[in-house]
Amino acid sequence: MLDLAQGRSVAPEALDGSRFHWICAKLVRSKPVAEPLMEMVEVDGLQIAYERAGSGPALVLLHSYVGDGPTTWRRQLDGLSDEFTVVAWDAPGAGRSTDPPERFGLDAYADCLAGFLDKLGLDSAHVAGLSFGGILALALQRRHSDTSSALILASAYAGWAGSLPPDVAEQRLRQALALADGTPEAFVGALLPTMFSKTMPRETMDDFRASMEEFHPRGFRAMAQASAEDVRDLLPRIDVPTLLVYGDRDVRAPLTVAKALQTAISGSRLVLLPDAGHVCNVEAPNEFNGAVREFLHDSHS
């Protein structure tokens, strides 16, 4: 693992002395917790599905524009619920949630998320987002800044237009909109290979593939269009503790994207997970969970 908070490289076994070992071991030997609970809540006429597990400070998990919440975050629902109330939602147009209306942009997603948190009685929560979920976490901070006590941005962008060269951002949106009109097989075939490193175990990849095959065309289209926005203006104004986590084999959000966010967000901490791709929380769950746990301990001690 590389901890670039101070511009230095640190091996996982050396991170904060023996503390990283203690954190990862805790994931294995922690006290038993209840099975995740599947629930549904209505927000502004939309049925929003989610799973939650554990007790303690709230940790809300936002998935990418492919897959669903429980599949994307299973290892965090299991691995962090000994200490946190972990909530993984299905965004409108994903998983078991209903599709959004037409012209449902990034601000609408952020407002829906704020309404979701309100329905759950969460005045403030640690908010973690993967890829599109990271963009959504930033949009939530921009429109409802009092809802996030800490941000964890994994494989995230300041929107595609805010983090990628213009031609790359435009091509990515064109591809996504074309895939939304195609078959599930074409959708999975085009995107799944870009989500993981070449060393990803087939069994784990197959689980993620199954969730991708159940994609909602309208929801995927809405999330792709929301992902294409530019939220760079927010970054210098972020005033909550922020952790950036990226896989060092990520071909979708490369290190240049990570470093640009670290530079723009004052006091942010950047951790690289070795040999992990875009869905780094799935590919390196123990390292990801350890980094999150340590960050939340440090930022609220």
Task: Walk through the language-model features, giving the residues of each.
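Conserved HGGG/HGGXW glycine-rich cap/lid loop of the alpha/beta-hydrolase fold
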Residues: V43-T98
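Active-site loop/oxyanion-hole signature of alpha/beta-hydrolase fold enzymes
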Residues: R74, D78, V87-A128, G290
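Gly/Ala-rich beta-loop-alpha elbow adjacent to hydrolase catalytic centers
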Residues: G129, G133, A137
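Flexible "cap/lid" loop of the alpha/beta hydrolase fold
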Residues: L138, R142-R143, S148-A180
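Conserved alpha/beta-hydrolase catalytic His-Asp/Glu region
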Residues: S163-V168, D181-P236
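Short beta-strand/loop motif that positions the catalytic acidic residue
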Residues: I238, L244-Y246
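Acidic catalytic loop of the alpha/beta-hydrolase fold
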Residues: D248-A253
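Catalytic active-site module of serine/aspartate enzymes centered on a nucleophile-bearing elbow/loop
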Residues: S268-S301
